[in-house]
Amino acid sequence: MSERLKNRHVLLTGAGGGIGLAVAEACMAEGARCSVIDRATAAPDAVRALQQSHPDKLAYIAADVTDTQAIAHMLAEAQVAFGPVHTLFNNAAVFDLAPLLDSDEASFDRLFAVNVKGMFFVMQAVLRHMVEAGTQGASVINMASQAGRRGEALVSHYCATKAAVISYTQSAALAMAPHGIRVNGIAPGVVDTPMWDHVDSLFAKAEGLPPGEKKRRVGLEVPLGRMGLPSDIAGAAVFLASDEARYITAQTLNVDGGNVMS
């Protein structure tokens, strides 16, 4: 590897598995130290395995991103582990089906609490830290989705939350530009992760499909002919965190095999 992130500290939320953990692994391969954040009290098995192979590069911190006090404690612990944060990979999110006429307040509140409130207040806390620390080459990467680019009948709340991520990314980028801090987003398409296994089970129930059928169909519908892999997203994240992207800000990069054109 080229060590594009050598000696940098990357803080990743929603990184107990799937895309978040794949990004952490890719960042460490490029020389970064990673604070891996997830809501589980104990580090998931996959995190522990990665920590054993990179004992000096990975710290696991349990935190609920919907709790602003927990966010403050998380950030303090991360600094104790590895010093000032250079990059935030803001990935924590939840998914649920929300048919427009049947959706209830609880589903609405849950998705917006994690996907919007949590995303914003984690970003705000880390940006304040970056400004105060005067961190050189600092950047934020917010995880959006192709669902934030267009409405979908069965996932209205999720689409709205991810559209909010794109909007906050643009606003934050303009606010932080005078400080030399870049803020970008990534909008994945359909990515083969445990979260998508959950999505598949929800659609199986809603549409009367056998398990795995929704995943099979959406993969075939992608112009490149397959679902994405966490490593596909990780490559984009490393690029955006690196100096190679030093003149890129306020953008949300589609990494979706051609599903969305912009």
Which role does the model predict for each range below?
Residues 16-17:
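Conserved glycine-rich cofactor-binding loop
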Residues 99-100, 107-112, 218-219:
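Substrate-binding pocket helix/loop in short-chain dehydrogenase/reductase
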Residues 123, 161, 169:
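Active-site helix of classical SDR
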Residues 128, 174-175, 246:
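Alpha-helical segment proximal to the catalytic Tyr-Lys
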Residues 145:
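Residue(s) in the substrate-gating loop at a strand-loop-helix junction
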Residues 150, 237-238, 249-262:
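Short C-terminal tail/terminal secondary-structure segment
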Residues 177, 182, 248-250:
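Short, small/polar-rich loop/turn modules that mediate ligand/substrate recognition or access, typified
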